[in-house]
Amino acid sequence: MMARRDPKSWAKRLVRAQTLQKQRRAPVGPSAPPPDEEDPRLKCKNCGAFGHTARSTRCPMKCWKAALVPATLGKKEGKENLKPWKPRGEANPGPLNKDKGEKEERPRQQDPQRKALLHMFSGKPPEKPLPNGKGSTESSDHLRVASGPMPVHTTSKRPRVDPVLADRSAAEMSGRGSVLASLSPLRKASLSSSSSLGPKERQTGAAADIPQPAVRHQGREPLLVVKPTHSRPEGGCREVPQAASKTHGLLQAARPQAQDKRPAVTSQPCPPAATHSLGLGSNLSFGPGAKRPAQAPIQACLNFPKKPRLGPFQIPESAIQGGELGAPENLQPPPAATELGPSTSPQMGRRTPAQVPSIDRQPPHSTPCLPTAQACTMSHHSAASHDGAQPLRVLFRRLENGRWSSSLLAAPSFHSPEKPGAFLAQSPHVSEKSEAPCVRVPPSVLYEDLQVSSSSEDSDSDLE
């Protein structure tokens, strides 16, 4: 009986039984786990939900098809917009637009407070509205146009300046421009700079352009008092660039006949040592000379700097002391000094002796002053030699102690025997003529010394 059974049919039956078992084991659909299997203390790392772990088959990340859609908790009628607005077009205006149109058509109602303010500012009594409504529109227009003071609108146009103030400002700017233009080293000033100034600045230009020494003295600073002429002198003016001061042009009146008119005096300043470079200052014109000029010793007051400087200069001193100022001493010049060169007697400006202090001030340091320079009388031959258009040259010498001395070289009109020692004695000051041998100095060394001196003077003026 057993041998008669077909093995193929047996195999078919076995396969059917296995498939039925597999179908029974496999879940038909997502079944909710029993409540005892959920543990709220557990948290899944995959989905972040509580009640199961990442290994559990209940995680929706593993069986995504079995994930349930979360249901809403409930509707909040208070916050939900139950009647949403539909988009309105121009053809179908909304109620807000209708309300605006009605308000514009209606006459504007004025409250009593607005009427009171209108009456206060405008000064006009409020108009009574007419029953037909025409007066209400006029009153609303009256509110829109205020009758009070209008605000001032600023424009880009510049306001007009008073011509008198404009002239003063132009004169001040021209004066500043001339001072700034003279601050460049090794530059000669032109005669037009003095003519561009106004009459007031022309009278006080000599006193204003002279720098004050860095050493502070008691009282007012000494000033070079001259009377500048408004026109060019007859004999022709010369420009002489000076070192160590802002006055870089001495315009000499070289007419010999003009010396016997009236006496005139001038006081020499106490010059600052090496404060400015060549070509600094303003043009000063001098008047005719005196009959009998008296000689006064001029002591060079050095302006000793706070720090050692290179290239100090001395202001040329050619002063003739008269009876108006009262010189401390009246000495006759030696014959060697009278033959050094011509010197003009500048005319005294409108100054009083109280405004011009004494010139014999001693420096605060215990350093001996340089030897005094005697002013020279003017000869007719030497004055006539300046009538031509001959250029004037300045000779600079470097001394052993590192200082500089300057001397004015003019065309020789007459030769006089001169000793070398006399020139060395006069080397701190500028003599108008010198026959001493010329010592050539490289321009770079001179320019560096002048730059150091000018920068130190600027620092001293800023500190003061």
From Swiss-Prot:
InterPro entries: FAM90 (IPR039213), Znf-CCHC_6 (IPR041670). Residues 74-89, 97-114 have a biased composition (Basic and acidic residues). Transmembrane segments: none annotated. Residues 1-42, 69-389, 415-437 are annotated as: Disordered. Residues 180-197 have a biased composition (Low complexity). Belongs to the FAM90 family. PANTHER family: FAMILY WITH SEQUENCE SIMILARITY 90 MEMBER A11, PSEUDOGENE-RELATED, PROTEIN FAM90A1. This is Protein FAM90A8. It comes from Homo sapiens (Human).
